[in-house]
Amino acid sequence: MTSKNKYFSTISILKIITYLLFVLFVYEKSYKQDYFNYDGIPYVASAHMLTGEGLVSSHAYAWNLLRSKSQPGVFNDLCCASSYRKSMYQSFEAFGSHLPSYQTKSLYVLTVRVISSLLNIDEFEALKLISFASVILLSFLAAFFLFNKSFILYISIFPILILMQIIPMARLLTPDSFNALLMFSAATCFLSQKKTAGYGIMLASILVRQTNIILFALFLLFELKERKYLKLIFYASLGLLIYFLNSSLFESIGYWKTYYSSLIRMPDTFVGFNPPFELSLIYSTLIGKLNWMLGNPELNRFPALMLILLSLSLLPLKEKSYWMIEKRLVPFIFTIGAIISFALIPFPDFRIYAGFLIAASLSLIANINEKRLTDKAR
C-alpha cells in the first residue's frame, strides 16, 4: 500500500468516526430524552384522523395520549398555559378550526400515520422518530455528498449543523427536520445537475411546508435562463396545482389568518375569525420583528446568518461566467428563498427557515474548488 493510499484510508476512517460520533451526540441530546411541544398534539390528531376517525374522537385521543405519556406539569403547561391552549383542550370545535394549519402539511402527517402503523407505535413516538431519523439522514447525506472534500471542509459539516439548531430540531415534534432533509436532498440534486429529481423533491416539499412553493418558483428560473418555456410552464402549473389542491382538500385558513394569528393576536378559536386585511400592518410588523430579533441575543442569529450566507453566496457570482453555472446559484437561491419567506411571514423562530439555510450552507461547501484555491495561493 502506497503512502498516499494509507493517508486516504486514515482520513476516510476519521471521517466515518466523526460522523458516528455526531450521530451518538444527536441521539444523546434528542432521541434519548422525553420531549413534548404543543404542535405535536394537532399532528397526532391529524394522523389519527387518517385511520377514519372523526374530529371529536381524534381530539380526545390526542389529548388522552399526551396525558398518558407526559408528566403532569408538562401536560398542564400544554393544555392550559394560555387561553388559546385552554380553548384547544376544552373544545373540539375550536381545536378543529385550527387543525387545517397542520393538516396542510399532508405529506408529513401521512408519514406519521405510516410510521405509526408500520412500527406499531403511537403517533407521538412516530413524530419523535421522524424528527430524529430526518436529522441522522440529513447528516449522512451531507457526509456522503461531501466525503471527497478535504478533512477540514468535511468536518465543518457538523458545527454548521449544530449552529443551525439541528439538535433542538431533532427532538421537536414538528416537520422542520423532515423539511430540512428534503431541502438538502433537493440541493444535492441541483448541485449534481439532476434538475428533474430536484424539482420532484421540491414539489413534494410543498406538502410539508406550503411556503416551499416560493423556493420552488425560484429554482424554476433555471428553465427561464435556458429559455425552456414549456418546461417552465409545466412545472409552474404542477406546483400551483399541488398547492391549491392541498389547500382546498384540507380547507387551509389562508395567508392572512395565518399571518395575523401568528404575529398579531392568536384567537381562542378560528370559528368566525376574520381579521381585516391591512397592508401597512405587514410592513410595520416586519420592521418591528426584525428590530426586536436583532436586539435579542437568542434570536439575532437568524438575520445575521441570512446576511452572512447572502454575502458568501454572492461572492463567487462576481465573476460573470459563474452566473451561467447553475450549481453556483444554488446557495444564493436557498438564501433568497429564506429571506422572501421571512419577509412574507416574519416568524421569530429559526426552525421555520433552518432547512433553507442548512441547504445554503452545505451547498457553499460543496461549491468550494479546493484545487483552484491552492493554485491561486501558489
Protein language model features and the residues they cover:
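Hydrophobic, aromatic-rich transmembrane alpha-helices
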Residues: F140, W292-I325, T335-I339, A360, ...
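Interfacial juxtamembrane loops and adjacent helix segments
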Residues: G52-T104
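Short acidic/glycine- and proline-prone juxtamembrane loop motifs at membrane-interface regions
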Residues: P168-F178, D349-F350
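Membrane-lumen/periplasm interface segments of specific transmembrane helices
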Residues: Y229-P316
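Loop-to-helix entry region of an early transmembrane alpha helix in multi-pass inner-membrane enzymes
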Residues: A94-S106, L110, L118-L137, R301-L305
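Specific aromatic-rich, kink-prone transmembrane helix
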Residues: L141, F178-A197, A359-S363
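Membrane-interface alpha helices of multi-pass inner-membrane proteins
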Residues: A187, T196-Q210, L215-F222, L238-L241
